[in-house]
Amino acid sequence: MYEQNSFEAKLRELIENHPSKEKEIRPWGGFITLWSDENFKVKILLVLPQKRLSLQKHKFRKEKWVIVEGEALITKGNKKFIMGEGNTLMIEKEEPHRIENRSKDKILKIIEVWMGEKLLEDDIERIEDDFGRV
């Protein structure tokens, strides 16, 4: 079993050393923007072991997820299910969703594609959050 601090250090190193100018560390892990255009944005989400993003929805964008490494517990609407490497999922505008990394020893990596009329980080309505950001 690995220490959470070693995962946080590894994640910080991955994000800080990436050449992208748009990257951020969050309480659940972090993200790196790989490409941004007028109508779409491509990011990689890095979710720390035993962490999850807020249960959230978006007014102006839909999202497509591709699990590239690890296994995720997904909440989509009122359904929960497991997705593994290679699985994809579409999240529609206004649809509540969440990603959770249930692994104890692996960073979850997801490619996230935003599509919509406004592609802003603040297009988020948090419904539930482990870090007090609701």
Predicted segments, located by residue:
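Short beta-strand segments
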Residues: 53, 79-81, 123
